[in-house]
């Protein structure tokens, strides 16, 4: 216990022990960074939980971390240490450089993985759950995004941010998880609570997800799914799949928890009994190559100090320029939580699902630049609704890398104490253009559309290399045009 206490209350700030490299993930419980141990040079993953914006009690978080420290299995991401710095808790874990199974679906197998690969993945996950349940612990958030791969293509269960310990009463009564993967008893918040069998239901949904590319009912709104799940019959795996795969999914998706097989019993099912492959290294290598080509990056929900964003103490996390937010809702949700759109908007593309166009809104035609080089914009600055100005390029404007404070525009906002956010060496290609096109790639309905989106990204990269600053001016002109239209200067 003493070593754990030292781990939690280390006097050395974690920022002095680890060198943060990049943000590799974000979720409701914090941001995940790739980092390097300054002493051993070991690459690790660090989940930084912003306690100021978390509803979790620090002692409860500590209890969760203590039982995570007890897990020792090659099928579970290894826990290393936990430290506190300022208002953040740093949870240091083993780094899985191969990404997640969700990455495989998004970048290589949009219509589902081959059955033999799913069989291997689920076999490893089932073994991991068997170990976890034997330790009297529940994962509570099994899905493709939380099944991680290391550099060698081996499977590991990750993201234990919402895991729970099975108490002596063998039940949990907290409402945690992701709607499409939730077991009926979790959605109902039954009086008797739920046990490790909730993970078995989620395992069945995840198997379905890996085979078909999406979880069942994903075309419906998450709240509707939660409302109707207890009343619906269990989903069935239909299509050109083996009887073994269908039997496995059906075995997991039994509504009565007591009738579901345990993880131990699932290992005797034919679907996971006769696996033919031993790793997914070739897929991991391909995904890593694609991420390099796409200049893949994540924008943290709560950026660390001295990184991309610099802010005063008065600026709260929800007021950062969040590139992953949409105009559909004021609630920020992660990319994995976005439900697919099923009905075409009158203004949407035939091949692309778009929740962004408002009713009656149309797409303006593309205009050609007057020359191959760009000059500074000399027209007045249009103030954005986000509370930030775009550099006008006028003589009295501040440096290009700084967003100037607002003056009269503050009257339109409830909070007047928000200071300007400074952006240092901002990469418009990586953080805006590439980010947008990657989202469009993920939302494309067919391979042909994805091919065109990918070609478009290549053109932006090529143009930026030949005409430095192209993407910055491009984004600036779009913003200015939108604001002009809003103000009636059509």
From Swiss-Prot:
Residues 18-272 form the Protein kinase domain. SUPFAM superfamilies: Protein kinase-like (PK-like). Pfam families: Pkinase (PF00069). Its EC number is 2.7.11.1. GO terms for molecular function: ATP binding; protein kinase activity; protein serine kinase activity; protein serine/threonine kinase activity. Transmembrane segments: none annotated. ATP binds at residues 24-32, 47. It comes from the Eukaryota. The active site is at residue 141. InterPro entries: Kinase-like_dom_sf, Prot_kinase_dom, Protein_kinase_ATP_BS, STE20/SPS1-PAK. Belongs to the protein kinase superfamily. STE Ser/Thr protein kinase family. STE20 subfamily. PROSITE patterns: PROTEIN_KINASE_ATP (PS00107), PROTEIN_KINASE_DOM (PS50011). Serine/threonine protein kinase required for spore wall development. One of its GO terms (biological process) is meiotic spindle disassembly. Keywords: ATP-binding, Cytoplasm, Kinase, Meiosis, Nucleotide-binding, Nucleus, Serine/threonine-protein kinase, Sporulation, Transferase. It catalyses: L-seryl-[protein] + ATP = O-phospho-L-seryl-[protein] + ADP + H(+); L-threonyl-[protein] + ATP = O-phospho-L-threonyl-[protein] + ADP + H(+). Its main location: nucleus. It is found in: Nucleus; Cytoplasm. GO terms for cellular component: cytoplasm; nucleus; prospore membrane. This is Sporulation-specific protein 1.
């Amino acid at each position: 216990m003493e070593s754990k206490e030292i781990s939690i209350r280390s006097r050395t700030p974690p920022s002095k022990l680890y060198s943060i490299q990049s943000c590799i993930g974000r979720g409701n419980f914090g941001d995940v960074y790739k980092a390097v141990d300054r002493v051993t040079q070991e690459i690790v993953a660090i989940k930084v939980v912003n306690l100021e914006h978390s509803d979790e009690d620090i002692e409860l978080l500590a209890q969760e971390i203590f039982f995570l420290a007890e897990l020792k299995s090659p099928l579970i991401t290894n826990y290393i240490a936990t430290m506190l710095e300022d208002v953040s808790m740093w949870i240091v874990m083993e780094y899985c450089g191969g990404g997640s199974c969700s990455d495989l679906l998004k970048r290589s197998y949009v219509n589902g993985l081959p059955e033999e690969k799913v069989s291997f993945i689920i076999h490893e996950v089932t073994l991991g759950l068997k170990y976890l349940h034997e330790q009297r612990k529940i994962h509570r958030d099994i899905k493709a995004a939380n099944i991680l791969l290391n550099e060698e293509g081996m499977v590991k269960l990750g993201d234990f941010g919402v895991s729970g310990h099975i108490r002596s009463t063998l039940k949990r009564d907290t409402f945690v998880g992701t709607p499409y993967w939730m077991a009926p008893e979790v959605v109902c918040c039954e009086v008797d609570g739920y046990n490790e069998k909730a993970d078995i239901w989620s395992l069945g949904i995840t198997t379905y997800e890996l085979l078909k590319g999406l979880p069942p009912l994903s075309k419906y709104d998450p709240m509707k799914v939660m409302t109707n799940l207890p009343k619906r019959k269990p989903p069935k795996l239909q299509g050109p799949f083996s009887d073994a795969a269908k039997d496995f999914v059906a075995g997991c998706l039994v509504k009565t928890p007591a009738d579901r097989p345990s993880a131990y019993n699932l290992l005797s099912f034919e679907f996971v009994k006769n696996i033919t492959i031993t790793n997914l290294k070739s897929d991991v290598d391909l995904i890593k190559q694609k991420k390099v080509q796409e200049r893949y990056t994540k924008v943290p929900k709560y950026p660390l100090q001295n990184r991309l964003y610099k802010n005063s103490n008065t600026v709260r996390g929800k007021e950062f320029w969040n590139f992953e937010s949409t105009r559909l809702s004021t609630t920020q949700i992660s990319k994995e939580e976005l439900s697919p759109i099923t009905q075409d908007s009158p203004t949407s593309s035939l091949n692309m699902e778009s929740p962004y166009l408002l009713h009656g809104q149309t797409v303006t035609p593309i205009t050609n630049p007057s020359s191959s080089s760009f000059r500074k914009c000399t027209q007045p600055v249009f103030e954005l609704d986000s509370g930030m100005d775009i550099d006008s390029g006028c003589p009295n404007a501040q440096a290009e890398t700084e967003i100037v404070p607002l003056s009269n525009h503050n009257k339109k906002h409830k909070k007047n104490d928000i200071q300007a956010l400074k952006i240092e060496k901002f990469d418009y290609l990586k953080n805006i253009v590439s980010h947008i096109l990657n989202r469009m790639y993920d939302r494309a309905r067919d391979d042909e559309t994805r091919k065109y989106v990918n070609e478009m990204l290549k053109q932006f990269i090529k143009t930026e290399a030949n005409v430095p600053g192209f993407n910055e001016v491009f984004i600036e002109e779009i913003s200015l045009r939108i604001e002009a239209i809003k103000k009636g200067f059509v």
